[in-house]
Amino acid sequence: MPFRAALRKVPVELYPLGAAVATAVGFATYSMGKKLLADPNVHIDPTVRRTI
């Protein structure tokens, strides 16, 4: 089934919910990516591996 045909079957009332979920997923991805790239405590150095 093409995407447009499937999109027509979605009730209009669910569009704001879809937009809110997409925005939340976008913010969560941005936040997680920023944390993983910026925080030096999160990086794992392959030469130094401690058992916790």
Swiss-Prot record:
Localization: Mitochondrion inner membrane
Major location (coarse): mitochondrion
Disulfide partners: none
UniProt keywords, alphabetically: Electron transport, Membrane, Mitochondrion, Mitochondrion inner membrane, Respiratory chain, Transmembrane, Transmembrane helix, Transport
Any one Gene Ontology BP term: cytochrome complex assembly
Database matches in InterPro entries: B12D (IPR010530)
Transmembrane annotation, as ranges: 14-30
GO CC entries: mitochondrial inner membrane
Pfam assignment, any one: B12D
Domain of life: Eukaryota
Family affiliation: Belongs to the complex I NDUFA4 subunit family.
Task of the protein: Accessory subunit of the mitochondrial membrane respiratory chain NADH dehydrogenase (Complex I), that is believed to be not involved in catalysis. Complex I functions in the transfer of electrons from NADH to the respiratory chain. The immediate electron acceptor for the enzyme is believed to be ubiquinone.
UniProt protein name: NADH dehydrogenase [ubiquinone] 1 alpha subcomplex subunit 4 homolog
